C-alpha cells in the first residue's frame, strides 16, 4: 500500500494531547510523525498502538551514533511497525550502511531516510559550526552519501527538492518539513513552501505540524490540504 503524502507532526508533550489530536485525523489519509518530544514522553507502546489502528508512522528520532548502536536502533523501530525511520547523514557512510543492513531481515522494512541539513539552519549557522558550504551544497553532498550507502531517501527542505530529484533520480525519496499552506505563519522554519508547490517540486512525503495541530478544526485543515494537492 502506498504511504500517505502527508505526515502530521505530533509535537505533543502528553499522551492525552496526542490521543486528542490523533482522534481528529483520518487514518490511511495522513500519517503520524513522532519525534523526540513525544516518543520520550510516552514511548514505543503508544506508537505501536497507532500502527495497529491503521496509521502510517514516521519515527523521527534522527539516530546519530556509532554504527552498531544505530543498527540496533533502526531494528527496534522496524519491530514497532513504523513505515519511515531516519538517521543523520553526517554520521557517515559506515553508520548509514550498518542501518541499511540491519533492516534487510524484515519482509517489509521501513524506508530508511537520512537527515541532511536541519531546515532551521541557515548558511551562517553552518559556517558557525565549521561547514563552509552553503546549506544547498551541504544538502547535496550528504544526500549523495546517503544514496551511495543504499538509503531510500533524505529529509530536505522543499527548496532543494528539484535539485535532488535531478541529481539523484526520481526514485530517491524526499521527505520535507517546513510545509506551510499559503495562509500560515512560517514559525521557526527558515526554508518553507506550500503543499502544492512542494508536490510540484518533487517532494514525496510532507511533514506538516502547526497548520494542522494548532488549527481550530484539525480535521477540516487536513481535508483542505489534501484537496489542495489533489488527494
From Swiss-Prot:
Pathway(s) per entry: Pyrimidine metabolism; UMP biosynthesis via de novo pathway; UMP from orotate: step 2/2
BP term (GO), one: 'de novo' UMP biosynthetic process
Transmembrane segments: none
Keyword Cell cycle on entry: no
CDD domains: OMP_decarboxylase_like
Catalytic activity: orotidine 5'-phosphate + H(+) = UMP + CO2
GO molecular function: orotidine-5'-phosphate decarboxylase activity
Catalytic residues (positions): 62
Record key words, sorted: Decarboxylase, Lyase, Pyrimidine biosynthesis
Known EC number: 4.1.1.23
One Pfam family named in its UniProt record: OMPdecase
Residue stretches in coiled coil: none
GO CC annotation: cytosol
InterPro entries with a match to the protein in the record: Aldolase_TIM, OMPdecase, OMPdecase_AS, OMPdecase_bac, OMPdeCOase_dom, RibuloseP-bd_barrel
UniProt: substrate binding residues: 11, 33, 60-69, 119, 180, 189, 209-210
Chain's role: Catalyzes the decarboxylation of orotidine 5'-monophosphate (OMP) to uridine 5'-monophosphate (UMP).
Quaternary structure annotation from Swiss-Prot or TrEMBL: Homodimer.
UniProt family annotation: Belongs to the OMP decarboxylase family. Type 1 subfamily.
Protein name: Orotidine 5'-phosphate decarboxylase
Amino acid at each position: 500500500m502506498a504511504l500517505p503524502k502527508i505526515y502530521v507532526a505530533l509535537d505533543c508533550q502528553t499522551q492525552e494531547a496526542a490521543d486528542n489530536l490523533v482522534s481528529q485525523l483520518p487514518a490511511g489519509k495522513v500519517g503520524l510523525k513522532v519525534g523526540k518530544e513525544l516518543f520520550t514522553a510516552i514511548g514505543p507502546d503508544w506508537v505501536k498502538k497507532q500502527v495497529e489502528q491503521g496509521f502510517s508512522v514516521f519515527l523521527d528520532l534522527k539516530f546519530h551514533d556509532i554504527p552498531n548502536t544505530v543498527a540496533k536502533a533502526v531494528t527496534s523501530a522496524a519491530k514497532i511497525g513504523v513505515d519511515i525511520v531516519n538517521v543523520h547523514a553526517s554520521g557517515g557512510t559506515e553508520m548509514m550502511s550498518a542501518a541499511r543492513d540491519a533492516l534487510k531481515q524484515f519482509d517489509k522494512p521501513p524506508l530508511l531516510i537520512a537527515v541532511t541539513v536541519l531546515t532551521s539552519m541557515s548558511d551562517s549557522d553552518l559556517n558557525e559550526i565549521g561547514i563552509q558550504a552553503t546549506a544547498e551544497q551541504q544538502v547535496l553532498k550528504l544526500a549523495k552519501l546517503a544514496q551511495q550507502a543504499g538509503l531510500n531517501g533524505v529529509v530536505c527542505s522543499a527548496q532543494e527538492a528539484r535539485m535532488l530529484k535531478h541529481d539523484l533520480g526520481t526514485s530517491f525519496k524526499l521527505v520535507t518539513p517546513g510545509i506551510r499552506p499559503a495562509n500560515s505563519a512560517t514559525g521557526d522554519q527558515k526554508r518553507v513552501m506550500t503543499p502544492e508547490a512542494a508536490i510540484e517540486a518533487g517532494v514525496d512525503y510532507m511533514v506538516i505540524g502547526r497548520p494542522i495541530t494548532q488549527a481550530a478544526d484539525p480535521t477540516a485543515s487536513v481535508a483542505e490540504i489534501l484537496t489542495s494537492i489533489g488527494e
